[in-house]
């Protein structure tokens, strides 16, 4: 049986999409040891897992000699014969040392940031080295594959495999407690647009705030719930004040993972009009939040950035918009708020799609095949 060493900078209790991606898959692997950075609350989190987590002394792991020695020692001590890099860059550079130490099979998974790296000459060479040193490089969707192919050698291009995330539809579901959230936030009688994301410019919360005055003119009882935290919060609060919509906006701040389903469920529409920035370096890899919203039964409004369109069936589960176009964002949100029947139908279609095509069990089975070398 394959025993896998997972080497990753991205792991709970640190919050984030990649962290959730890696944890959900690790929790479904048969025999696994995780090597991850230190983080506040890690001891309590690790004790609750059904697999071993070994923490690096610091909160960041880079492909240094120290990290390499620790990873090699762990591989040997635990008898691991496979390695999964939860994010290919930059820790995938450890592959040769782990191969020499006995790793028979090495898989490196890419996300949105590797698609950005593929645009930069030096970073592109790093990706090329990683691709040549591992057995498989995985990608999220067609957009990220296209970006990666331009960075990888012909040999590595032939070893690209899709590994998409899943959604726990028993966790993200309609009726998950949204009424309580709306009541607690003073939104019980409002039609709520919800956005769940880290507060950074690429995610488009600023465009939602600029769209809100026009939304309110068409739907006076609308409100915007911005869930999450991040470095852009003060700027977003200033925009809300400048647009004179602060009374119709709620900033939740950080929300515990266990409380996320209720916050999705507090909305009638999910909107995150993400946009590509920095000449393609800052781009949406996929946008699992759209799938979590769909699982909750919400119609979605997504930005056309990177792989985000892979998480929406246009016209069936939601709308795709230019994330910079305030009028387009306004129009999609208003259309959904003013036609509850259509919005409900889109939400139902989205949940059915996620239940059929986006399960964690299927993703974990795929990863297991890749780690064993049995994928076809």
Question: Across the structure, where does each feature detected by a protein language model lie?
Answer:
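Nucleotide-activated donor-binding/catalytic signature segment of Leloir-type glycosyltransferases, i.e.
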Residues: 234-261, 269
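Conserved acidic donor-binding segment of nucleotide-sugar-dependent glycosyltransferases
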Residues: 313-327, 335-341
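Short His-centered aromatic/hydrophobic patch
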Residues: 85-91
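Short hydrophobic beta-strand element within catalytic cores of glycosyltransferases
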Residues: 271, 290, 294-295, 299-302, ...
